[in-house]
């Protein structure tokens, strides 16, 4: 008999909460589980719940519904009716990377000294929130807070609010906002049938790339399915500290690096906006134009307006779907046995069209009895 050792996370670091999935400590052995549990998506665009710094990851992925690559299916023996072509969802441009350097010391979770750590999937707001108090090797304390969202209102949009405050001393900061294409997979086990197909060559091929001020646009296309993808990022930095920025981009990489002379107690707010557009027919010029139109609108709105729209969407969702969260039953609706809003001590009658009652009558059984 095969025995498997079950990994049990420490309960104090993963406390139960009504509205949040909480992580109170960094545990590398649970990276894969947390990336899945803390993922954000809106049905079109999805981002696994890895850290903003780009790692460490079990399988860092940003995915788009319907963006796939085709490949031949090879069988040991061929037969009539066997599928010849397979389709695999491919990882797209990772635009959520934000790296932090304090006096040239990188913030990297496996080697960092966090004095406090809190990361949570906020089910009321539809965001992934994180707050870390980091002490650098030089003893400088840095408060890092971030909030990530994938918009439910505009399916092409995602955004990150990344905030840094030095508490006890000044320092030279670099906040590097990056986007990367065709990153190698971190942990792919070729013998695991649950894993996605491994492509040996390039999947996304460069079509167009350019930068405008703090905005970078990268356009790629799959080789065989000929689906086109455009990813654009733009930024807004707010701080009273002296700062400058530098933009670098290539076929598969984009970077906007902000250099800040941070003072203690002076907050630094970076808003990063990401836009994804795909098409099976539009060319690179048209798709880049669409991404720019969307980005212009998003930048004008700002992160707070995106967040407010997200919170309103989630509030409407919970009110409509959950009777206990403010949903008011219509006058003609009768309480159901499984309806937590109904009175369990009072008898009730089902609507005339109740499918469960019809099935019971056809089977010669009694209809629902009143709850006693």
Language model: regions and residue ranges:
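Acidic/polar, glycine-enriched structural segments that form the non-catalytic walls/loops
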Residues: 2-372
């Amino acid at each position: 008999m095969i025995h498997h050792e079950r990994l049990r996370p420490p309960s104090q670091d993963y406390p139960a909460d009504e509205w949040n999935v909480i992580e109170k400590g960094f545990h590398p052995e649970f990276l894969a589980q947390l990336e899945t549990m803390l993922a954000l998506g809106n049905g079109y665009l999805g981002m696994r719940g890895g850290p903003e710094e780009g790692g460490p990851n079990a399988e860092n992925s940003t995915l788009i519904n319907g963006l796939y690559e085709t490949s031949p299916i090879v069988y040991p023996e061929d037969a009539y009716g066997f599928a010849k072509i397979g389709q695999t969802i491919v990882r797209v441009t990772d635009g959520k990377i934000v790296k932090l350097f304090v006096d040239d010391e990188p913030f990297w979770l496996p080697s960092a000294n966090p004095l406090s750590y809190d990361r949570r999937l906020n089910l009321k707001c539809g965001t992934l929130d994180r707050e870390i108090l980091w002490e650098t090797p030089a003893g400088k304390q840095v408060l890092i807070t971030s909030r990530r969202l994938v918009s439910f209102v505009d399916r092409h949009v995602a955004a990150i609010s990344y905030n840094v405050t030095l508490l006890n001393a000044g320092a030279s900061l670099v906040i590097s906002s990056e986007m990367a294409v065709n990153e190698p997979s971190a942990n792919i086990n070729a013998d695991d049938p649950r894993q996605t197909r491994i492509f040996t060559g390039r999947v996304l091929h460069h079509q167009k790339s350019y930068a405008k001020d703090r905005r970078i646009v990268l356009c790629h296309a799959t080789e065989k399915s000929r689906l086109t993808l455009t990813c654009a990022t733009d930024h807004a930095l707010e701080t009273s500290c002296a700062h400058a920025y530098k933009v670098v981009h290539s076929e598969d990489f984009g970077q906007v690096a902000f250099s800040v002379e941070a003072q203690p107690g002076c907050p630094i707010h970076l808003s990063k906006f990401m836009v994804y557009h795909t098409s099976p027919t539009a060319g690179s010029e048209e798709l880049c134009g669409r991404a720019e139109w969307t980005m212009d609108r998003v930048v004008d709105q700002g992160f707070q307006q995106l967040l407010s729209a997200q919170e309103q969407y989630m509030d409407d969702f919970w009110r409509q779907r959950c009777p206990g969260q403010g949903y008011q039953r219509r006058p003609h609706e009768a309480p159901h046995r499984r309806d937590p809003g109904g009175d369990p001590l009072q008898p009730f009658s089902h609507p005339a069209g109740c499918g469960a009652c019809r099935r019971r009558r056809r089977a010669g059984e009694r209809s629902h009895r009143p709850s006693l």
